[in-house]
């Protein structure tokens, strides 16, 4: 029996907050008894006269985003005595959409029987060999469960020959959609034997969707094991979800289909037409997104018309539902930020720099941590309200008045990096440390040859050999070894964005307010296990009018003050490049964009009865919705990302290049990613040995990976006794084929795609997806504001070229006022305000987040093997918490422990402590566990 432990999807139906200040409600039990808390039962279902009793173990799977899922050992809700009819009863919990008003409730809901439920047999009719006719019943209102949920009941006369109930069908004759909670079916008077259909899905009015909604009992079946009476329903349900590929999708649709990213621009906007290349296809390879079917642009036949509605289509149960009182309204917030970035295009002082480094500090409210959280949404609600009323006024302010306006409107929290050490951003040691313990720890790689070489065409981009020579290296490492010895001993590491960025340098430099170089940064691993930066190389390729320019900068350069300031400028440039690659590649591409095809394919090819669907589904929660919002306001033409990061309008195109050149599914598993970058090797025993022993992201991540992999392997071995069962699973193979051929169609012919032909390959594939959606995303997302919220630490823009490139007046200005040149290189005040606001939002956990190791699917509790496997997984996460805490307090681990150092907690699971992960505590955005899914 479902208990009040699982939140409804999104707002009005979200999980209870740990704070009493928030008003919440959860899915109620369909039948609740005083003092009966959580009721799980042994189902004893039979006629009341001569039947024998059949015992089945029954549990539920609380689907995380609106689909009906679950597991039972056998759903034997049937009449044992085949000579009698039995009266069966169904109880149903329903929440009506807020679109249905008080009048609807009083008249339609109480006085009319608008909800119908059909019982479907799991057996075929022995005489016809066809599916039995369902038994229908009108559901009548029986009372209120609470302020949000209503209880309905129906009775059925079930013939003795009907057999076990294999499914229920639901029809909504009301004119408003409803959220279906639970359906419980049991012989009248035998509630303790009830089997629950955990639905948790929006049911549209029959005039919108003529198909009856189907929900299965909770037993997980491979396709070959499906009861004969519901085989057809299982297949038809998947056909409905696949759709026909035609027509524009409506908000109430549940259809999953694929399309290219052809909706980022807006060619039809008469005031500000924008076009962006189509992402997906031979020219710009890319993962596919959800098809909306909107008409093509009138002015650009390759582009889809931009949505004129606030909502971009995603299948109904993937969308956020009504937001509960006080919850974060991300759509409205991002809409206001988008309006602000649009306004920046015409603001006469949009490029205004900060007047001093101390002025940046004024963005943050020193007393923030002592402020009470506002009762209706806290800081985010405050920002939304003020943005609505004071946006235009803000544009009119000048100088110090504008800075004060930003401070008053946004009231930013002091980022943790600045709160712990105000000078951390300036120190080279911290610059290096953040490459392995910051917000983008998956770009650094081992240097395996010297000189470092480019793979670009020399005729176009200049000499292949890097300007960072052996002499430069040996001078910087004080000749403790030769450059060749440093390579051989695995002492040299680098961030290498040279080949990725260099082809875009001239394009980006034509844009206002940004500049670009091809870049590399080289680091040396010291004897105490920490990294030290030793060189930064910046390159501008030749053009028709100018020869190639490139220069290597080193700490202190020539030992002069001027050289020290040039080094700080060079750091600002490569930090901006790293911030762009982090946001566009490590974050958006590798998690959000690449995951959407897995979700689409799973819903098209895997039945909700399928065990693999149930394993993966918690990891897909809200991802399609957040991606749709991103296409509308974050990654679109002229959106927040283009206005805030170095590549500007080429941002998404650049991520396409990275997808084409770098992305491989088999390398997305953490161990394989580390090996590819040279950051780890496998020893003869198959164990990983890290190139940097104290590598916080890898140390913690491998613990998380191992726990996920073992959980997936045990799960797979339980449902597939032998490898042949995997190969013969038609739904599983169709899912994986569609991921390759449709979801990632531009890479479908690559030889590295794994075959699902063994327990190991299947477990590795599933674990890779589960890791990307949980650990990988947590590592790149939730540290954004704590680390990048202080602009000098992680500037997202570099607006001014290096003075040594230009020379003349630029160099003279730099010598006279180096701090001003550095501030002119950092993002402007406008850009900073936008970046901080969006990073603050993205780094904040949802109040109804589901965390790895703490969210248990009820379906697993009554299956002995799966329940034990999950308990072991849960115990593994608890041990990871202890290990991470121990490492963060170990003075020998200098990359995560030290004076003023931000500890690495992004991959620290939740330990269940009631004070751990309080969504109302806005100082804890980094310390709330690892969410299962990409939900922000």
UniProtKB/Swiss-Prot annotation:
* Post-translational changes noted in the entry: The N-terminus is blocked.
- Please name the GO terms that the record assigns under molecular function: linoleate 13S-lipoxygenase activity; metal ion binding
Which pathway does this polypeptide act in?
Answer: Lipid metabolism; oxylipin biosynthesis
Q: What is its EC number?
A: 1.13.11.12
Low complexity biased stretches: 47-59
**Where does the chain bind Fe cation?**
587, 592, 777, 781, 936
Provide the alphabetized UniProt keywords: Chloroplast, Dioxygenase, Fatty acid biosynthesis, Fatty acid metabolism, Iron, Lipid biosynthesis, Lipid metabolism, Metal-binding, Oxidoreductase, Oxylipin biosynthesis, Plastid, Transit peptide
Q: Disordered: where is this region?
A: 1-69, 264-308
Matching InterPro entries: LipOase, LipOase_C, LipOase_C_sf, LipOase_CS, LipOase_Fe_BS, LipOase_plant, Lipoxy_PLAT/LH2, Lipoxygenase_dom_3
Q: How is the cofactor bound?
A: Binds 1 Fe cation per subunit. Iron is tightly bound.
Q: Where is the Lipoxygenase domain?
A: 220-936
Describe activity versus pH. Optimum pH is 7.
Q: Can you say what this protein is called? A: Lipoxygenase 2.1, chloroplastic
Taxonomically, what lineage is the organism?
Eukaryota, Viridiplantae, Streptophyta, Embryophyta, Tracheophyta
């Amino acid at each position: 029996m479902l208990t009040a432990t699982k939140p409804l999807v999104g707002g009005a139906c979200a999980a209870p907050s740990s704070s009493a200040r928030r008003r919440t409600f959860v899915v109620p039990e369909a039948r609740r008894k005083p003092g009966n808390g959580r009721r799980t039962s042994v189902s004893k279902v039979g006629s009341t006269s001569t039947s024998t009793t059949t015992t089945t173990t029954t549990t539920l799977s609380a689907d995380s985003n609106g689909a009906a899922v679950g597991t039972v050992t056998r759903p034997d809700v049937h009449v044992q005595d085949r000579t009698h009819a039995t009266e069966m009863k169904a109880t149903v919990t329903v929440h009506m959409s807020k679109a249905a008003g008080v009048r609807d409730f009083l008249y339609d809901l109480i006085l009319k029987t608008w909800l119908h439920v059909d019982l479907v047999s799991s057996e075929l009719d022995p005489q016809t060999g066809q599916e039995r006719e369902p038994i229908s019943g009108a559901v009548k209102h029986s009372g209120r469960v609470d302020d949000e949920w209503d209880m309905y009941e129906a009775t059925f006369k079930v013939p003795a020959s009907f057999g076990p109930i294999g499914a229920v069908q639901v029809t909504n004759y009301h004119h408003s959609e409803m959220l279906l909670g639970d359906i419980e079916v049991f012989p009248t008077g035998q509630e303790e034997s009830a089997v629950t259909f955990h639905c948790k899905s929006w049911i549209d009015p029959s005039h919108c969707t003529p198909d009856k909604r189907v929900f299965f009992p909770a037993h997980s079946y491979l396709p070959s094991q499906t009861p004969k009476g519901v085989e057809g329903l299982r297949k038809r349900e998947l056909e409905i979800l696949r759709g026909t590929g035609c027509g524009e999708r409506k908000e109430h649709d549940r259809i999953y289909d694929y399309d290219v990213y052809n909706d980022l621009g807006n060619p039809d906007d008469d005031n500000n037409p924008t076009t962006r290349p189509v992402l997906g296809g031979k020219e710009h390879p890319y993962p596919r997104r959800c098809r909306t079917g909107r008409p093509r642009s009138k002015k650009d036949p390759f582009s889809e018309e931009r949505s004129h509605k606030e909502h971009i289509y995603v299948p109904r149960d993937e969308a956020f539902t009504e937001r509960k009182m006080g919850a974060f309204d991300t759509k409205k917030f991002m809409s206001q930020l988008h309006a602000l970035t649009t306004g920046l295009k015409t603001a006469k002082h949009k490029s205004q720099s900060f007047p001093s480094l101390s002025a940046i500090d004024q963005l943050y409210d020193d007393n923030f941590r002592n402020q009470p959280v506002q009762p209706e949404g806290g800081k985010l609600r405050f920002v939304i309200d003020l943005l609505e009323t004071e946006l235009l006024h803000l544009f009119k302010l000048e100088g110090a008045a504008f800075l004060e306006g930003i401070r008053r409107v946004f009231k930013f929290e002091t980022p943790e990096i600045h709160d712990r050490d105000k000078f951390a951003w300036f120190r080279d040691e911290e610059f290096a440390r953040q490459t392995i313990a910051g917000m983008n720890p998956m770009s650094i790689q081992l240097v395996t040859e010297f000189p470092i070489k480019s793979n670009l065409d020399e005729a176009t981009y200049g000499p292949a050999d890097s300007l960072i020579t052996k002499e430069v290296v040996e001078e910087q490492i004080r000749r403790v070894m030769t450059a060749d010895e440093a390579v051989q001993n695995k002492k040299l590491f680098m961030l290498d964005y040279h080949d990725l960025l260099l082809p875009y340098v001239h394009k980006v430099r034509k844009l206002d307010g940004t500049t670009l170089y091809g870049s590399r940064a080289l680091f040396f691993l010291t004897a105490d296990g920490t990294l030290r930066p030793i060189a930064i190389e910046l390159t501008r390729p030749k053009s028709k009018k100018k020869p190639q320019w490139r220069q290597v900068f080193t700490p202190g350069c020539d030992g002069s003050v001027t050289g020290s300031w040039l080094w700080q400028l060079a750091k600002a440039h490569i930090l901006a490049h790293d911030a762009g690659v982090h946001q566009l590649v490590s974050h958006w591409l590798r998690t959000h964009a690449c995951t959407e095809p897995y979700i689409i394919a799973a819903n098209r090819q895997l039945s909700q009865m399928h065990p693999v669907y149930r394993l993966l589904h918690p990891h897909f929660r809200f991802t399609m919705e957040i991606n749709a919002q991103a296409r509308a306001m974050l990654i679109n033409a002229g959106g927040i990302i283009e206005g805030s990061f170095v590549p500007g309008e080429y941002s998404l195109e650049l991520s396409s290049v990275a997808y084409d050149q770098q992305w491989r599914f088999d390398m997305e598993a953490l161990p394989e990613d580390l090996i590819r970058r040279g950051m780890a090797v496998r020893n003869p025993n198959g164990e990983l040995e890290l190139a940097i022993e104290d590598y916080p992201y890898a140390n913690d991540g491998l613990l998380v990976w191992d726990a996920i992999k073992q959980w997936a392997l045990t799960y797979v071995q339980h449902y597939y006794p032998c490898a042949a069962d995997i190969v013969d699973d038609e739904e599983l193979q169709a899912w994986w084929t569609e991921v390759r051929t449709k979801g990632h169609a531009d890479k479908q012919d690559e030889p590295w795609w794994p075959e699902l032909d063994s327990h190991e390959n299947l477990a590795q594939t599933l674990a890779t997806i589960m890791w990307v959606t949980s650990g990988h995303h947590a590592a790149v997302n939730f540290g954004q504001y704590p680390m990048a919220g202080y602009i000098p630490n992680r500037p997202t823009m570099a607006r001014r070229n290096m003075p040594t490139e230009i020379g003349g007046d630029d160099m003279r200005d730099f010598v006279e006022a180096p701090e001003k040149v550095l501030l002119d290189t950092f993002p402007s005040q406008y850009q900073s305000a936008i970046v901080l606001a969006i990073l603050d939002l993205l780094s904040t956990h949802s109040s109804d987040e589901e965390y790895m190791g703490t969210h248990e699917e009820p379906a697993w509790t009554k299956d002995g093997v799966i329940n034990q496997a999950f308990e072991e997984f849960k115990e593994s996460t608890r041990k990871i918490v202890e290990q991470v805490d121990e490492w963060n307090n170990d003075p020998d681990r200098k990359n995560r422990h030290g004076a003023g150092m931000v500890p690495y907690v992004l991959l620290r699971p939740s330990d269940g402590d009631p004070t751990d992960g309080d969504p109302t505590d806005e100082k804890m955005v980094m310390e709330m566990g690892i969410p299962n899914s990409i939900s922000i």
